[in-house]
From Swiss-Prot:
GO biological process, one term: proton motive force-driven plasma membrane ATP synthesis
Stored NCBIfam families: ATPsyn_F1gamma, PRK05621.1-2
Organism: Heliobacterium modesticaldum (strain ATCC 51547 / Ice1)
Family: Belongs to the ATPase gamma chain family.
Cellular component GO terms held in the UniProt record: plasma membrane; proton-transporting ATP synthase complex
Superkingdom of origin organism: Bacteria
Any GO molecular function: ATP binding
Membrane topology: Peripheral membrane protein
Keywords: ATP synthesis, Cell membrane, CF(1), Hydrogen ion transport, Ion transport, Membrane, Transport
Protein name: ATP synthase gamma chain
UniProt function note: Produces ATP from ADP in the presence of a proton gradient across the membrane. The gamma chain is believed to be important in regulating ATPase activity and the flow of protons through the CF(0) complex.
InterPro entries attached to this UniProt entry: ATP_synth_F1_ATPase_gsu, ATP_synth_F1_gsu, ATP_synth_F1_gsu_CS
Length: 290
C-alpha cells in the first residue's frame, strides 16, 4: 500500500487538475452558448438559399455553369474541419477517422484542412494538402468562410480536383454531435430542397426572369451558396467542439472527484493503520518495562 505522503501528494495533484478541468468546463459552456446562437441564426438562411438555388437551377436548366457541371472524377478533394486544440473528447478523432477510412490507400485525393488537428494528422500520413487554415479562433466570421470557399472553387475550376466533399461535425446538443459528409462541388442539382419537390408542391410555380442573364445570376448566386455552406459547416463544427469539450471536461471533473474520494479513503485507512501500529508499539513497550 502506498505511504501517506505519496497519497497526499496524489490528492493534491488531482485536486489541482480538477480545478483546471472545472474551469475549462465553465469556459466551454459560455462559448457554447454563443456558438449555438450563431448556428441557430445561420441555419434558416442556409436552408432558404438551398431552396432558391434549386428553383433557379431548374428554371435555367439549359445553362452550363462550371460549378454545376459534372465531369469524370479523377481526383477528389476533401474539406476537413477539425479543431486546433484537443481536450474535447472524440470530436477530432471522429472526423479524422471518417475521412481516413475513405482515403486510406488512395492517391487520388487532395485535402483542404481547417484546424491544426486535421492538418497535423494528414501531414504525418503523407497526404496531399492543397491548403490549410489554422488559428481561426473562437469568433468565426463570414470572411473566413469566403477565403476557404475561394480556394476550394479555384481548385475545382482549375481542374486540380473533380469533386469536393465537405466533412464536418453537425451540432445537435452539448451531448450529441455527428460527423457528416456532403458533396460541395459540383453543386448537386437538387441541393437542399429539390427541384422536383418544388414542382410537386401545390399552387402555381413562379416564372423566373433573369436579369441581365441566367449566367450572370448564377455567377453571383452559386459562389454565395458554396460560401454559405462552408460558413454553416464552420459554425456547426465550432458549436460541436465546445459542446464536446464541455462534456469531456465535466466527465474529467467528476472522475477527479471520484479518485479524490477513493484516495482520501485510502489515506484514512493508512493513517488508522499507522496509529494502531504506534499504539501497539507503546503498549508493547509498556508491557516490556512492566
Amino acid at each position: 500500500m502506498p505511504g501517506m505522503r505519496d497519497i497526499k501528494r496524489r490528492i493534491r495533484s488531482i485536486k489541482s487538475t480538477q480545478q483546471i478541468t472545472k474551469a475549462m468546463k465553465m469556459v466551454a459552456a459560455a462559448k457554447l452558448r454563443k456558438a449555438q446562437e450563431k448556428v441557430i441564426q445561420a441555419r434558416p438562411y442556409a436552408k432558404r438559399i438551398q431552396g432558391v438555388l434549386s428553383r433557379l437551377v431548374a428554371a435555367a436548366s439549359d445553362v452550363n455553369h462550371p460549378l454545376l457541371t459534372t465531369r469524370e472524377v479523377k481526383r477528389v478533394g476533401y474539406v476537413v474541419i477539425t479543431a486546433d486544440r484537443g481536450l474535447c473528447g472524440g470530436y477530432n478523432a471522429n472526423i479524422i477517422r471518417k475521412v481516413n477510412n475513405e482515403i486510406k490507400g488512395r492517391d487520388d485525393v487532395s485535402l483542404v484542412c481547417v484546424g491544426r488537428k486535421s492538418r497535423d494528422f494528414f501531414k504525418r500520413m503523407g497526404k496531399r494538402i492543397e491548403a490549410d487554415y489554422v488559428g481561426l479562433g473562437e469568433d468565426i466570421s463570414f470572411g473566413m468562410a469566403k477565403e476557404i470557399a475561394a480556394k476550394v472553387m479555384e481548385l475545382y475550376e482549375q481542374g486540380t480536383v473533380d469533386q469536393v466533399q465537405l466533412v464536418f461535425t453537425e451540432f445537435y446538443s452539448a451531448l450529441t454531435q455527428k460527423p457528416v459528409q456532403m458533396q460541395l462541388l459540383p453543386i448537386p442539382a437538387q441541393a437542399g430542397e429539390s427541384a422536383n419537390s418544388a414542382k410537386d408542391s401545390k399552387g402555381p410555380q413562379p416564372l423566373y426572369a433573369f436579369e441581365p442573364s441566367p449566367e450572370a445570376v448564377l455567377d453571383e448566386l452559386l459562389p454565395k451558396y458554396v460560401e454559405n455552406q462552408i460558413y454553416r459547416a464552420l459554425l456547426e463544427s465550432k458549436a460541436s467542439e465546445q459542446g464536446a469539450r464541455m462534456t469531456a471536461m465535466g466527465s474529467a471533473t467528476d472522475n477527479a472527484k471520484e479518485m479524490i474520494n477513493k484516495l482520501t479513503l485510502s489515506f484514512n485507512r493508512a493513517r488508522q493503520a499507522a496509529i494502531t501500529k504506534e499504539i501497539s508499539e507503546v503498549v508493547g513497550g509498556a508491557a516490556a518495562l512492566g
